[in-house]
């Protein structure tokens, strides 16, 4: 991670079957300078996706979303700044439309306060980062995917290297299995 160069850690966790599958990579151009943002709204599989500057804030944001049975959370310095619980499939809430709109606007302001760039929707950006049917690079529970070549890539940054261990899974919408040879 290098927030000074606008590079933060990104992680996607499988949240439906308890498989423990995860993908870890990096996100550039998001603007985050502190804290973490997590959401269970992540197309198409709606797994848990977290972007952050520190592992501890990422873990807290992810845990807040897990405890809420889905949602959107913003964390800074070990403090949960805000959460929109989405307990219906991790995508919906019994709250009124007005209450949801107000909470989303509050969370967007909080994310902007952490450095998310103006003009970027912090939550929809994360929702599409994991969608492995649109070019070019996407991160899902299989790892970093080169969508056009349909390959899992290794991720490294400086001395840190991440090996995404899940192989043999399906790329959503591709109809092809990823084989260990393509890793």
Protein language model annotation of sequence segments:
Residues 1-183:
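Active-site microenvironment of metallo-dependent hydrolases
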């Amino acid at each position: 991670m290098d927030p000074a160069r606008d590079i933060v850690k990104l992680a996607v966790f499988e949240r439906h079957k308890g498989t423990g599958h995860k993908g870890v990579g990096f996100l550039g151009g998001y603007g985050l300078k502190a804290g973490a943002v997590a959401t269970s709204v992540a197309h198409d599989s709606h797994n848990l996706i977290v972007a952050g500057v520190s592992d501890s804030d990422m873990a807290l944001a992810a845990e807040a979303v897990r405890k809420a049975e889905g949602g959107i959370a913003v964390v800074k310095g070990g403090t949960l700044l805000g959460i929109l619980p989405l307990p219906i499939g991790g995508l919906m809430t019994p709250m009124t439309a007005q209450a949801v709109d107000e909470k989303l606007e509050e969370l967007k302001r909080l994310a902007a306060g952490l450095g998310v760039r103006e003009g970027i929707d912090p939550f929809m950006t994360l929702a599409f980062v994991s969608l492995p049917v649109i070019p070019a690079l996407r991160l899902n529970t299989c790892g970093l995917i080169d969508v056009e070549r349909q390959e899992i890539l290794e991720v490294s940054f400086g001395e840190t290297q991440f090996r995404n261990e899940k192989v043999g899974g399906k790329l959503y919408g591709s109809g092809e299995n990823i084989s260990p040879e393509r890793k």
